Design a protein with these regions (language model features):
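Short, hydrophobic alpha-helix immediately C-terminal to the catalytic nucleophile
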Residues: 104-105, 241-245, 331-335, 356, ...
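Short, basic, helix/turn surface patches
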Residues: 125, 321-331, 375-378, 474-479
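Hydrophobic (often cysteine-bearing) scaffold residues that line and stabilize catalytic clefts
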Residues: 17, 96-99, 118, 205-212, ...
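ATP-dependent adenylate-handling ligase core
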Residues: 273-334, 360-369, 391-392, 415-423, ...
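Short acidic/histidine-rich active-site segments
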Residues: 342-352, 358
Length: 555
């Protein structure tokens, strides 16, 4: 992952503004430790911190058009860049081998109306010096983070993380996924829209296992483009195991040559983390042996996790309970991954949102309710699992890719008949995924019950967090929580504890408002609480909150 930051709509360029932009970028240098670049001109300053994945030698940013009249800062990966390059061969004089440079070619040809042509994950700012206009855009689901702010003088600020904006502008907010901001229009607009968000569109559709298998294998294959060593996150759960097995299938050949040459790093490395004896570690070992990866198992202690909490909250920029719980082991794991020279990993985020894999989906009363909840979950994912995976890894300069959220794959998976995804009663969740890839996995994993990452790393991790935070926050503090935190007032002591640390790092109201705060059972939306009367008095994101479904449920 790279980092971008900068200032737009500048009336008069000054040294002070350039220095400010540099300081903003320095705050997110962990995202791009390989190189720094800055553009100052017209009414814009664009700064870039680079993590080199594709074309490490010549792909530095900001990127420029051949006449240097357009400049681009991108955090992202454009998976179909080779197809776009081929389309513009002889029509556009590419300056680098960077996958992101195709954005400039598309802009030259189509103006701002090209975002649907891109397959990838991205957040970018394009400044047209000739027209003195700019375009900001973010990928469909929000895999890549982006924030936008302003000051009293009308200048516009942007940054990959809160820390690039906190204290630098007067207010800021999340730049919404699937949206763009064109300076000529002056407001954020949606560019990504799909019919499958409506139940009426999908209710009579087919649901073929083979379609899921082909589409996901193609997504993984697309996302293996890399000029640096890569690996897979292998928790031992279904989702990461499927991604790992597919990646192993293609790892021996270089996809940039369509398999015509051997891969530069043909041996696939897999990574798992947990407390000693954790459920995930046992299953991850089984999968690694079955598919043949070089497996790395990292043990951490509860105390090591507790010691990292303050840093974790600083890097992930949230006080959401389930995100903090799950981000801590991922943050620790990312440090080890980077120490081994790995810069990119594939991960299994998104499957539970797309296929209704969380255990509360067992309670969905109708196919329509099930489908509408998956759509809601996808629309909010940028504040939860996308944020966790991106920021936990980028804290150590590691890029995460998520094939289950691939744009083309979503158009297949979200168009499936919701009846085929449902899991009433004790029926296993994500059956269609299990059936599609059962032959590629050990049976014990292919049919393993859903285990949330923060649970699977070891049940004592969450149990200790609840105990520690209960002791650290007094009843009196909870009584006055609304006075101290009027925005998203903490509802329990664990929330209060994380919120207190967050406020130390990010004291502004703008920061507080970027974090979601809604009642939830095992990661549900607030709307899904109506599915079961037992949910209504619970506010616990762990999968063990779903009594009668989880095999180790709270009693």
């Amino acid at each position: 992952m790279c980092g971008i930051a900068g200032i737009l709509n500048i009336k008069v360029q000054t040294k002070e503004l350039r220095d400010k932009a540099l300081k903003m970028a320095q705050k997110i240098r962990h995202r791009g430790p390989d190189w720094s670049g800055i553009y100052v001109g017209g009414s814009a300053i664009l700064a870039h911190e680079r993590l080199s994945i594709v074309d490490p030698q010549s792909g530095g940013q900001p990127l420029y058009s051949p006449d240097r009249k357009q400049v681009l800062a991108v955090n992202g990966e454009i998976y179909n860049h080779r197809d776009i390059r081929a389309k513009y061969a002889g029509k556009y004089n590419f300056q680098t081998g960077s996958d992101c440079e195709v954005i400039l070619a598309l802009y030259k040809d189509k103006g701002i109306h090209f975002l649907e042509d891109i397959s990838g994950i991205f957040a970018f700012v394009l400044y047209d010096e000739e027209k003195d206009e700019f375009l900001i855009a973010r990928d469909p689901i929000g895999v890549i983070p982006l924030y936008i702010g302003k000051d009293k003088e009308g200048k516009i600020y942007f940054g990959s993380e809160l820390k690039a904006l906190e204290g630098f502008c007067d207010e800021y907010e999340i730049f919404l996924p699937g949206h763009y901001f064109y300076s000529k229009e002056g407001k954020m607009k949606r560019w990504y829209s799909r019919d499958w968000t409506e139940y009426e569109t999908v209710k009579e559709n087919d649901a073929q296992t083979v379609d899921v298998k082909i589409a996901l294998e193609e997504a993984v294959h697309r996302q293996l483009m890399s000029d640096v060593p890569y690996g897979v996150l292998l928790s031992g759960g279904l989702d990461s195991s499927v991604i790992s097995a597919i990646a192993k299938k293609y790892a021996a050949k270089r996809i940039e040559t369509d398999g015509a040459s051997d891969a530069w790093w043909p041996q696939l490395h897999s990574f798992a983390i947990g407390l000693k004896g954790a459920p995930d570690l046992i299953k991850a070992r089984e999968v690694a042996e079955y598919i043949g990866t070089v497996h790395h198992e990292i043990n951490y202690t509860v105390q090591e996790g507790l010691d990292a909490l303050r840093d974790v909250i600083y890097f992930i920029e949230t006080y959401d309970v389930t995100t903090v719980r799950a981000s801590t082991p991922m943050y620790l794991l990312a440090r080890v991954i980077k120490s081994m020279g790995i810069k990119m990993v594939l991960s299994g985020e998104g499957a539970d949102e797309v296929f209704g894999g969380y255990l509360y989906f067992h309670k969905a009363p109708t196919p329509q309710a099930f489908h509408e909840e998956t759509v809601r979950k996808l629309s909010k994912l940028h504040m939860y699992d996308c944020l966790r995976a991106n920021k936990s890894l980028s804290a150590w300069g590691v890029e995460g890719r998520v094939p289950f959220l691939d744009k083309e794959f979503l158009d297949v998976a979200m168009n499936l008949n919701p009846k085929a995804k449902m899991c009433p009663g004790k029926e296993i969740e994500k059956r269609i995924v299990r059936e599609a890839f059962a032959e590629m996995l050990p049976e014990s994993v292919a049919w393993r019950q859903k285990e949330q990452f923060s649970d699977g790393v070891g049940y004592s991790w969450i149990d200790t967090l609840r105990e520690i935070t209960a002791a650290a926050v007094s009843d009196q503090q909870m009584e006055h929580a609304a006075e101290r935190f009027p925005i998203n007032t903490p509802q329990n002591k664990e929330e209060y504890y994380y919120r207190s640390i967050f406020e130390e790092h990010f004291p502004s109201e703008s920061a507080a408002r970027t974090v979601p705060s809604v009642p939830s059972v095992t990661c549900s939306t607030a709307e899904a609480l109506a599915w079961d009367i037992a949910f209504r008095n619970l506010n616990e994101p762990s999968g063990r909150a779903v009594r009668g479904i989880h095999e180790e449920a709270y009693t």
